[in-house]
Amino acid sequence: MARILITSAIPYINGIKHLGNLVGSQLPADLYARYMRGRGHEVMFICATDEHGTPAELAAAKAGKPVEVYCAEMHEIQKEIAAGFRLSFDHFGRSSSARNHRLTQHFAGQLAENGFIEEVSERQVFSVADNRFLPDRYIEGTCPNCGYDKARGDQCENCTKQLDPTDLINPRSAISGSTDLEVRETKHLYLRQRALKDEIEAWIDSKTDWPVLTTSIAKKWLHDGEGLQDRGITRDLHWGVPVKKGDQPWPGMEGKVFYVWFDAPIEYIAGTAEWADANGKTEADWERWWRTDKGAGDVRYVQFMGKDNVPFHTLSFPATIMGSREPWKLVDYIKSFNYLNYDGGQFSTSQGRGVFMDQALSILPADYWRWWLLSHAPENSDSEFTWENFQASVNKDLADVLGNLVSRVTKFCRSKFGETVPAGGAFGEREHQLIAELQERLAAYESCMEAMEIRKAATELRALWVAGNEYLQSAAPWTVVKTDPERAQAMIRLSLNLIRLYAVISRPFIPDAAASTMASLGCDDWSWPTDVAAALERLPAGHAFTTPDVLFRKITDEERAEWQTRFAGVRT
């Protein structure tokens, strides 16, 4: 049994996330966590809300609430919606936790002690109208790289180029909209990433199995232009982790907080400690996941994130870990994603464009969305959500293929043999051919899941469903029963067991449908079907079941048109 540590990029607190956020981190991480648990491995799956920085302050101000109150409320909302999508976190924490405060300050102290922190006097934008320095995200303007007119002072969300506020064309305050800005001098702490470049580069070069997307972004940031740069890790904000050197004051840094991208990844570790606190565990229980000197040496650590988060996870966070000179666990594999676009444009939280997680759950259950998003995950290139494609995929894959098989088998059995698994005779050549095909396809599915090739895994899973449908169609028990009832019983016995097999292997993608199917079958044996032939004997003759309701209903043209119109505008 392996030990798998899984983290998803933690979502910003500034509002409910859209489907593009979901498919770029949390949902594929959940798929992998569920699969690994299903195979019997020990899994620790951690996520949290990212509560510090400019987005939190701006969103709270817009909502007319103190930032602490706003963050507490939004954490509960995001937690509830995540549960609605059946995201199976072992813990969903908060980057504003006391654990993360202490751990962030600890790392900063270690970095300073080891010579990897430098105090820098710099010129920063000051808003006369707002009477304050404006951190990166408090400044908006036109991107000098692509011309996008709502670029932020730290990064353009359109082209992903990292920026400094002074790079922006026609900059303005995100608080007041004022263009009355000045550049004044202030002091900040910088993480000396350049001093760690050789270590970081050697580490990245050792990751020969990483996706091309991850590696290419990391190496681009290492080598393009002037190469890896030192990074400011403090900000002039009111809300965040106060700057301390361990548990001691940091002279000259009074009133400042750590940059959100410094403390946010540390929450992966702190969140695991929060899990221990919440579940009556000891320090050793969480340290065995993170400290290589305390049991984490055999842990495989996998991160999931959108491509815009890759630079921070391949460079800045590893620099923090390495520079601490303490035995913390570094990531083994980073699964990164391109963007999911929406009907010809981009999903956007800040602009309210697209379908958001709460809206999605208000019109259809989670499994419909999980299946479409995962089977269209933007792995090798950007992908696009359209309502036509969504309708077609749900209707064909879920309703016509999987749902139809479950319905036909259970209803036919009920009408001819009652709601118990029939006995029948031995399996014939047709059944043995199916078993061989299923065994081969199951191996392909497992291989894709192990490799985190999500779209390919969905394709292989669908092929497994199709194989069962093709068998049922060619075996035609509804015809055979007229002349050879015992043979028809054997076919249905196999088919009922096949439904259980499908529930088990489909659970990572569609957990609710899997659970309801197993409940209808009166079965709680979720053991993985390593041996397909044995798995197809799991429900013995005489085992009682109940005919389930429709597993997946079809989306009508009228519904599709109505939703397309409803979500064509901007969420306010």
UniProtKB/Swiss-Prot annotation:
<feature type="short sequence motif" description="'HIGH' region">
    <location>
        <begin position="11"/>
        <end position="21"/>
    </location>
</feature>
<feature type="binding site">
    <location>
        <position position="156"/>
    </location>
    <ligand>
        <name>Zn(2+)</name>
    </ligand>
</feature>
<dbReference type="GO" id="GO:0017101">
    <property type="term" value="C:aminoacyl-tRNA synthetase multienzyme complex"/>
</dbReference>
<keyword id="KW-0030">Aminoacyl-tRNA synthetase</keyword>
<feature type="binding site">
    <location>
        <position position="159"/>
    </location>
    <ligand>
        <name>Zn(2+)</name>
    </ligand>
</feature>
<feature type="binding site">
    <location>
        <position position="349"/>
    </location>
    <ligand>
        <name>ATP</name>
    </ligand>
</feature>
<dbReference type="InterPro" id="IPR041872">
    <property type="entry name" value="Anticodon_Met"/>
</dbReference>
<keyword id="KW-0862">Zinc</keyword>
<keyword id="KW-0479">Metal-binding</keyword>
<dbReference type="InterPro" id="IPR015413">
    <property type="entry name" value="Methionyl/Leucyl_tRNA_Synth"/>
</dbReference>
<comment type="similarity">
    <text>Belongs to the class-I aminoacyl-tRNA synthetase family. MetG type 1 subfamily.</text>
</comment>
<dbReference type="InterPro" id="IPR023458">
    <property type="entry name" value="Met-tRNA_ligase_1"/>
</dbReference>
<dbReference type="GO" id="GO:0046872">
    <property type="term" value="F:metal ion binding"/>
</dbReference>
<protein>
    <recommendedName>
        <fullName>Methionine--tRNA ligase</fullName>
        <ecNumber>6.1.1.10</ecNumber>
    </recommendedName>
</protein>
<dbReference type="Pfam" id="PF09334">
    <property type="entry name" value="tRNA-synt_1g"/>
</dbReference>
<feature type="binding site">
    <location>
        <position position="146"/>
    </location>
    <ligand>
        <name>Zn(2+)</name>
    </ligand>
</feature>
<dbReference type="Pfam" id="PF19303">
    <property type="entry name" value="Anticodon_3"/>
</dbReference>
<dbReference type="GO" id="GO:0005829">
    <property type="term" value="C:cytosol"/>
</dbReference>
<dbReference type="InterPro" id="IPR029038">
    <property type="entry name" value="MetRS_Zn"/>
</dbReference>
<keyword id="KW-0547">Nucleotide-binding</keyword>
<dbReference type="GO" id="GO:0006431">
    <property type="term" value="P:methionyl-tRNA aminoacylation"/>
</dbReference>
<keyword id="KW-0436">Ligase</keyword>
<dbReference type="InterPro" id="IPR014758">
    <property type="entry name" value="Met-tRNA_synth"/>
</dbReference>
<feature type="binding site">
    <location>
        <position position="143"/>
    </location>
    <ligand>
        <name>Zn(2+)</name>
    </ligand>
</feature>
<dbReference type="InterPro" id="IPR009080">
    <property type="entry name" value="tRNAsynth_Ia_anticodon-bd"/>
</dbReference>
<dbReference type="GO" id="GO:0005524">
    <property type="term" value="F:ATP binding"/>
</dbReference>
<dbReference type="GO" id="GO:0004825">
    <property type="term" value="F:methionine-tRNA ligase activity"/>
</dbReference>
<dbReference type="InterPro" id="IPR014729">
    <property type="entry name" value="Rossmann-like_a/b/a_fold"/>
</dbReference>
<feature type="short sequence motif" description="'KMSKS' region">
    <location>
        <begin position="346"/>
        <end position="350"/>
    </location>
</feature>
<dbReference type="InterPro" id="IPR033911">
    <property type="entry name" value="MetRS_core"/>
</dbReference>
<comment type="subunit">
    <text>Monomer.</text>
</comment>
<keyword id="KW-0648">Protein biosynthesis</keyword>
<comment type="function">
    <text>Is required not only for elongation of protein synthesis but also for the initiation of all mRNA translation through initiator tRNA(fMet) aminoacylation.</text>
</comment>
<keyword id="KW-0067">ATP-binding</keyword>
<keyword id="KW-0963">Cytoplasm</keyword>
